[in-house]
């Protein structure tokens, strides 16, 4: 059975109330250099936003130019509001171009706490995040902190990200 967002959200916590505003989002995989996502429009229509990310199981790593092109083209999808963990050295990106295009498309770039974990499969996370943040500051591009929470105990834990951003 498919559930309506308001129906599900209302059972757990009010969609709005007090200082909490609950949004429904999804992380979608970028599949190719055209920026195609692995979720159909009919699913994207039911959410508030999509976070688009490159993952090795859905995207074959290309050159810096190809990886950047895939990310930038994903910005053309009206549901994409965030680019997830653009810090993985397995998928090198041109941060100058990425940040300029994200700013123009009003897409936030994620600073992912899990990328700072030494056990992460992502390569060069800390160094890449520092470079990304410097470029974002140069262009006054917003970032968003994310935890990449695949386990409930990681939700809201930004210790490494907060330390790095100080």
Model-derived features: positions:
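Extended substrate/RNA-proximal surfaces in nucleic-acid metabolism proteins
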Residues: 2-111, 166
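Histidine/acidic-residue-rich catalytic or RNA/ligand-binding cores of hydrolases
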Residues: 92-101, 119-135, 152-165
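Short acidic/histidine-rich active-site segments
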Residues: 141-155
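His/Asp/Glu-enriched short active-site or ligand-binding loop at hydrolase and phosphoryl-transfer sites
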Residues: 108-121
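A short, structure-level motif marking secondary-structure boundaries and short turns
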Residues: 56, 83-84, 116-118, 145-148
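Short, active-site-adjacent cap segments at secondary-structure transitions
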Residues: 30-31, 116, 152
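C-terminal active-site rim and adjoining tail of enzyme catalytic domains
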Residues: 112-114, 133, 146
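Short hydrophobic "helix-edge" motifs at membrane interfaces and signal-peptide entry regions
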Residues: 75-76, 137-140
